[in-house]
Design a protein with these regions (language model features):
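Acceptor/aglycone-binding surface of glycosyltransferases and processive sugar-polymer synthases
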Residues: 64-78, 83, 95-173, 199-219, ...
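Conserved donor nucleotide-binding strand/loop of the catalytic core
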Residues: 32-33, 46-78
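A conserved acidic beta->alpha catalytic loop
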Residues: 38-47, 91
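Catalytic donor-sugar/metal-binding loop of nucleotide-sugar-dependent glycosyltransferases
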Residues: 147, 169-171, 181-198
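Cell-envelope/extracellular polymer assembly enzymes that use nucleotide-activated donors
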Residues: 2-4, 33, 178
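Acidic helix N-cap motif at the loop->helix transition within catalytic regions
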Residues: 14-18, 43-51
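Short, well-formed alpha-helical segments that are part of the catalytic scaffolds
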Residues: 12-26
């Protein structure tokens, strides 16, 4: 098994070098590559990436900013691994936790694994932001008769070919809801493991907003309606 870690990067000059160094230092139990996509950064991120060298690094760049979802698609198109794991460059997630997601796959217990965050004392989010995340997750559980703990998590480990077959079209943060919704529509229930999470504040560069939550609910509803129509026609989701 080979793992491809996909890193979308946009204006993360303060954190990207440390994020990549931390990833490179992890002792993975399988061959690994790191596909980094600079989504047309303007803050010096590109120059920092140019100075990083490792045989496991694949560096790509968008000429125009397209969004996180588009950057992940670009990374997945270039990936050569059997499994993929997105990783944000802002260091809200811990690289070492990827090992926890790999364990149930390597034991043969799961095919898709999500890292479930806890919003505790290290979170910079407001009460309403946390409730928004939980609300979107609840909507998904109701629509698809499922029970998952954290729909919006970045930590989604799955086979590369499964990701490609989902045909994700969201260019921005909506990719998280689209991936989860399309998995649930196929009756694929992710195995979940707890992970460490330390949220950034708006002042530190957090980019996601309440509008992304509204979009997530819309995407989930659309996917569910499309899935029900396909089921009535006898077409696989």
């Amino acid at each position: 098994m080979k793992l491809s870690i996909l890193m979308p990067v946009f204006n993360e000059a303060e954190t990207v070098q440390n994020a990549i160094k931390r990833l490179l230092d992890v002792q993975f139990p399988c061959p690994v590559e790191f596909v980094v996509v600079d989504d047309a950064s303007t803050d010096g991120t590109s120059e920092i990436l140019d100075g990083l060298h490792d045989d496991r690094l694949i560096k790509l760049r968008h000429a125009v900013n397209q969004g996180k979802g588009a950057a992940v698609r670009t990374a997945a198109a270039a990936a050569t691994g059997d499994y993929i794991q997105p990783f944000d460059a802002d260091m809200e997630y811990q690289p070492e936790d990827i090992l926890e997601l790999l364990k149930p796959v390597l034991r043969g217990e799961a095919t898709v694994v999500f890292g479930s965050r806890t919003f505790g004392s290290h979170s910079a989010y407001s009460f309403w932001y946390v409730m928004g995340n939980k609300g979107v997750t609840t909507v998904a559980n109701i629509l698809f008769n499922a029970y998952i703990a954290d729909l919006e998590t970045c930590f989604k480990l799955m086979p590369l070919e499964l990701y490609r077959s989902l045909d994700i079209t969201s260019d921005g943060f909506g990719m998280e809801a689209e991936i989860t919704g399309k998995l649930l529509a196929r009756q694929i229930r992710p195995f979940e493991v707890p992970i460490t999470y330390r949220a950034r504040s708006r002042e530190e560069g957090k980019k996601i907003t309440w509008k992304d939550g509204v979009q997530a609910v819309w995407l989930l509803t659309r996917i569910r309606m499309t899935s029900k129509r396909a089921q009535r026609r006898g077409i696989p989701s």
